Amino acid sequence: MAYNWQTEPNRAEPQEGGHDHQQCHHADQHLSSRQVRLGFDQLVEELSNKTPLPEDEKEGTCFVPDTPNLDSKWQSIYGPHPRHFNEFTSQSPHFSQLPFGKASAIGFNPAVLPAHQFIHEGASWRNPTRKYHGGEDPRFSALTPSSTGLDKCHQQGQSGTEHCNYYVEPENNVPHHYSPYSMDSIPDSEEKGSGDADLVEPSLVFSKDSFLPRASENMSVESTEPIGCPLEIVEAPQGSNKSLASFCNNVTKIRGLYHASDTNSNSGKIWAITTAYPSRLFADTQFRVKISTDNSAQLLLLKPPANYLVKDLIAEILLLCANEQLSPKEYLLSICGSEEFLQTDHCLGSHKIFQKSKSVIQLHLQRSRDTPGKLSRKRDDDRSRVHLNQLLEFTHIWKISRQCLSTVMKSYNLHVEHLLKTQEDVEEKPLSSMFSCGRHPPQPHGNDIIEDVRNICSVLGCIETKQVSDAVKELTLILQRPSQNFHQNSETSKKGFIENVTSELSRSLHQLVDVYCSSFCTDFRPARAPGGVSRDHAGLHSHLSFTVCSLHNVPETWAHSYKAFSFSCWLTYAGKKLCQVKSCRSLPVTKSFSFSVNWNEIINFPLEIKSLPRESMLVIKLFGIDSATHSANLLAWTCLPLFPKEKSPLGSRLLSMTLQSEPPIEMMAPGVWDGSQPTPLTLQIDFPAATWEYVKPETEENRTDHQEPPRECLKHIARLSQKQPPLLLSVEKRRYLWFYRFYCNNENSSLPLVLGSAPGWDEGTVSEMHAVLRRWTFSHPLEALGLLTSRFPDQDIREVAVQQLDNFLTDELLDCLPQLVQAVKFEWSLESPLVELLLHRSLQSIRVAHRLFWLLRDAQGEDYFKSWYQELLAALQFCAGEALIEELSKEQKLVKLLGDIGEKVKSAGDAQRKDVLKKEIGSLEEFFKDIKTCHLPLNPALCVKGIDRDACSYFTSNALPLKITFINANPMGKNISVIFKAGDDLRQDMLVLQIIQVMDNVWLQEGLDMQMIIYGCLATGKAQGFIEMVPDAVTLAKIHLHSGLIGPLKENTIKKWFSQHNHLKEDYEKALRNFFYSCAGWCVVTFILGVCDRHNDNIMLTKSGHMFHIDFGKFLGHAQTFGGIKRDRAPFIFTSEMEYFITEGGKNTQHFQDFVELCCRAYNIVRKHSQLLLSLLEMMLHAGLPELRGIEDLKYVHDNLRPQDTDLEATSHFTTKIKQSLECFPVKLNNLIHTLAQMPAFSLARPAPQTPPQECCVLNKTRTIQRVTILGFSKTHSNLYLIEVTRSDNRKNLAKKSFEQFYRLHSQIQKQFPLLTLPEFPHWWHLPFTDSHHERIRDLSHYVEQVLHGSYEVANSDCVLSFFLSEHIQQTLEDSPFVDPGDHSPDKSPQVQLLMTYEDTKLTILVKHLKNIHLPDGSAPSAHVEIYLLPHPSEVRRKKTKCVPKCTDPTYNEIVVYDDVSGLQGHVLMLIVKSKTVFVGAVNIQLCSVPLNEEKWYPLGNSII
């Protein structure tokens, strides 16, 4: 985790080392009624529970704060108990009266961190010897350090703090002489000396001014703190960290653009999602809409066209209701069952609900004024301000630290004052009077002062600079010397020395506090600025150098385990190292107040400052030399940007270090680790007292070096751009593309590809990249999405990308919102255009704000960037307003309750789980009694008011997810069931479903509705989240179970199930059509994404025919293995039982050809958007998903998309995958294993009653069967029998029944009449396989006769009558339920379908399908196609396809290529169809008359001409 010293609280157990009797202050009590809750409620609650406020028995005792919420790593190092100097006392009567009876034990575990910057020996207090020679450079302008330069650079370098949201307003309580953010500069001064070595070991003499002060304008050396000036700090509502205060100010400005009175941006309503109108899909579509109104109970049934505007529909409704005088602008249409409203300025077909729902849509008409937006911002929200101290109060950390620091400072000031006063009294007395008493002069308050210094350092993270240490030692020596050893004049007396030393000690402490406030985010700062000095600035041609001074607060366990410590550092940019790693010497720890390591080593990189990229990062790693093995072990690391806000760091910096095992080089950005949040381990670095401001060079575009490329080069550029993503381009291809960059445009290339091919990030290359950027015209905003990946850290490039995304509609932004949240990681500051875009859109849309809230909540569980996400989340909550924040707070409480219930259900035994769940449901009922209503995190438009207790349950899978059914708060809506799952990472499911949704959107825009069901999924935290339940959906495993033990091996299982649940012909045809399209869609998406772990338990079907997949824990080809063999052996799931249903039991084999055509068409449409899909996946590479981590995962998707193929090649490829899936027997075997595993759960021994094997028609019991005769059997399907049924009225009808259907009838009779003696059914052992089918007919006829002439009750039962009398549904299917992409010829003549292309002497022939082909005896052939090009210069003229066995309508989709064809004129294509060696048909085609690039059916003759 990014914050290793914080752990998740265990509220059931007291903290180790804590005090159970102590009380905690709740975070809420710090909020006034007008303050806005800004997030971190969970963090507040954790700290409130984990951080007791101890009340010491001894009055006047104060506890210096310990480190808050140390996690296991820090606790194992520092231990859970505070050390002895965390507690300090005073016997002073003045000190005992100070108000610190209670203080929180929050802060830092004691240990001392060593001295600050050391420079050459002989350097005076204000005169360091090092010198930097300045120079001119167009990229940088040297800035002399101002009196506040250190503060400015330190603050700008911070990426943020964990606790952010503050008032940004003028501070009236700050003394006027303190100017924390002044930009005034001070004069330069000439200094001598320079360092050329990479590693320079300076003298151990410490420079007294290494802490660069924050004085006001032109403050010189003499402008120092006067003697006797006390240590004081003041509250800083804006925060001591300037970058965070600036971010708060920026957030306030953004929120100020959207006033509560603006109903356009602040309607408070949730609008239905809209997309671009898919005109191809809804060319002549009319929707069926039912309208309800408040004034009438009668529903209006309308059929408006898809392009009908919502406001026009409202006007028509008002006209029909005789309310023509009312204005349509005063009304809105809401979707029944939700709090979602149609957007009045959009057409109906643009709304997602109309695009996906094919049933009647129910809408409700209501006045706008009667539906006030309950989630809108109020005027009080406009008056609230974002205030740093609000967040800091929530944590209790800095507020109490400020109190403690102020307390110990007051103690220090009192003791210093008493010491000087006492010494003055002593020296005023005659020496003789002192010696007459036989004693030395007293040494009052000396030890108290040293103890106060120790406590001040402890509050400040146990940071003890060498200045402080030296001053303490000097004070101790002076106090130990007798007064007679000093001269008696005012300057050389003991009192004079004490005044000088205490003044120096105060100044050192003051500088320590100042640098601490500059480096870390606190809500206090020194009341006065330290004195300033004049400095030279280093030349831009100088090499980058800085001094690594000290490591503070080294754990005692490390001091004993490691004999020495060292560090290494390097520079990174865009995930790559800019130079070789620099290492330092190893040194042991030293002990003063605590343990520290003092290196004071100068690091000099062989890189000129002007050559460094603007977004360079410095990374430092700490190593410990093991005492036993002498090996170097990585202990901690930290990082910081070299040019935060385009200026270099200045002076001394304190950096917190993290115990993460390795720094993520590929993710190195300012937010990866927030050094402004103190940790127990702190590193001190000194930068030169100069700064540089980055100036973007203005360069002219130069194309004189490049001649106009030939046509072949432009074609090659287009091929490269269409075939490869940037990450997978070879070095040669990138070099080629970059060389011709000025000839790339949006027609032949993509901007991420061109810029990603740049050879580096030096000044010249970046300038050329900016030149390409300026002249580029984007074809679509989504093209810019690839510029926000980690490969493009340049701020100008990212800004252009955000400008393009700003052209998106707000609803369109939702499709890529998870990727944008991840892209925040690689921004250079929280004031970036991307962050501003997210906040702007959140203020414009409640749906965006709601989704962004939960994405940020979930992102805080990642290992890195946690602080940035917390600050962005706080800014979002500030912008959202109190009403929305209150709703989000309810949702968080609901999530917590469900998480607790899930844990209790898991911990209970199998027998007690149901009882535990029923008992815990009561807590949800109490929750709704208190809050009345709550929106669901899964969808903010769904508002619920209670729990349907009887409908709640849990699933028996490993994670034991809960099924929770909520009562809809909308009276016109049904109950809402969701799955709450804890224990599985749902972020991967979210990503897969998001990519599938993008594919579906692409299909819809192309006019192709694949009938996809894409359910909702939302991760709400670490390994927990919600999943939408699709009504009336069952797993394929349950369907297999109802078909007996070997149900997965049967081919008619799916067909039979749909027949049972769709009694009407119209319903059956609709289900068949929905299955046809949805099965094709899921075949495509699961193949492209490589979804694994596919079996009948994660494939679901609805009665309306929709098929969809669930559970995406394995994808990108990461299949599970058993004994080294992959369990997923098929490219995707398409089994013979699915084909059996599509082809209606093999009767319509041309439907399989239609299915293949649909799959290939959908596949080729998605392939056109390969770059978009790869960009979306690439942006999630650093999200910490278990199966998406590297380039090889992207390459897997790229290889499945095959963007380098033509559409013909891709069609042939995917057809091969369909055939491989269809022939993969291990899929059926895997389904069988899962079915057997489910047998105990479904009680297969006594299955539940189910419907008859045929559709259940309502029959009249007076109708009886006179006779049933089995006439024969099918030649193609040997288990299908033709029967003739004679009714009592002598009417006859024919039906086809399978052997399995007869068996199902027998089973149904047994269940319905368990007490009757029934005839024995002829099982398979009565029907030997070697016997003829006539014997089977005889046995079945005997069985039917016994059934009909036996018991009257059985013969006239519903199941028997429905079996024989109801017409077989397939007899009524005369019209094809499919929408064929091409035209079908009504005749039955044999034909072949071809598609031909001709380009650059290359003739390509795609052999697609044959139909209506038979052998001379009428049987199905095993046909292949032979093709001859006549005449052909080559000897090899014949080319042939593979053989398709036993099929009258075979599918091939195979490519035949002839090269070196100079022209089509005079060439004839001879095509022959054979079944092995038997001739089937042939055709000769004159190529000059062939329509190229078009599919065409050619008739086959019976001879070769």
Curated annotation (Swiss-Prot):
Domain spans labelled C2 PI3K-type: 540-688
Ranges for region Activation loop: 1109-1135
Keywords attached to this entry: ATP-binding, Chemotaxis, Kinase, Lipid metabolism, Membrane, Nucleotide-binding, Transferase
Localization in the cell: Membrane
Parts forming coiled coils: none
Keyword Acetylation in annotation: no
Membrane topology: Peripheral membrane protein
Any GO MF annotation of the entry: 1-phosphatidylinositol-4-phosphate 3-kinase activity
Domain PIK helical span(s) in chain numbering: 703-879
Domain C2: 1384-1505
Tissue occurrence: Predominantly expressed in normal liver. High levels also found in regenerating liver. Very low levels found in heart and testis.
Location of region: Disordered: 1-32
Name this protein carries in UniProt: Phosphatidylinositol 3-kinase C2 domain-containing subunit gamma
Organism: Rattus norvegicus
